Amino acid sequence: MKKAEVVIQLHKPDASEMLFFFLCGVIISVPLTLFIYQYTDSLLIGLDAFTIALISRAFFAPFIEEFSKAYPLFYRHGETQRSIFDLAVLVGLGFGIVELLTYVSVLGTPIIYRLPALLFHPASTSIIAYGIATKRPLPFYLFAVLLHFSNNYFALTLTSPFQLLGSIFVVAVAVFTSWRLRTRTKEKIVI
């Protein structure tokens, strides 16, 4: 008697699926982040302004934002390691664009200080995606959180131009790590 063989076709995301994941970064990750912030910031009432900023932006923000960006990646079916990784870049890019526009147009932050984040968010999200694709999400999530913490900590504690230099350094580490991890992904289905 022959054993039954199951063949699973590799799934490559088409343009509409890629757009879906980009929009997830815009319409799911950003609102989820803002919703969680609403509750975490209320826990800090009574502290001085710098301490609130440090705890909120350097500690809470990395955990919240990295989770919010990775969240849509758990909605996938029959994806390969490589496609999960690539979809993560799109989620991070969607998140990064909305964050850039918010900081520049609403908060009046000079665009030069926000441009590194446009590279950081896709890179950090893809680092987490590598962990998801290889069934080890926690260490890669925590590494992305550490990078995010470092970037935000430098932004809060360093003075200009060192803020920008610190950000460029952290972004370079994130982008390099993302690139190295992408070379390790395979067209192997993730079940």
Where are the regions that the model predicts?
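Hydrophobic alpha-helical segments at protein termini of multi-pass membrane proteins
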Residues: 1-191
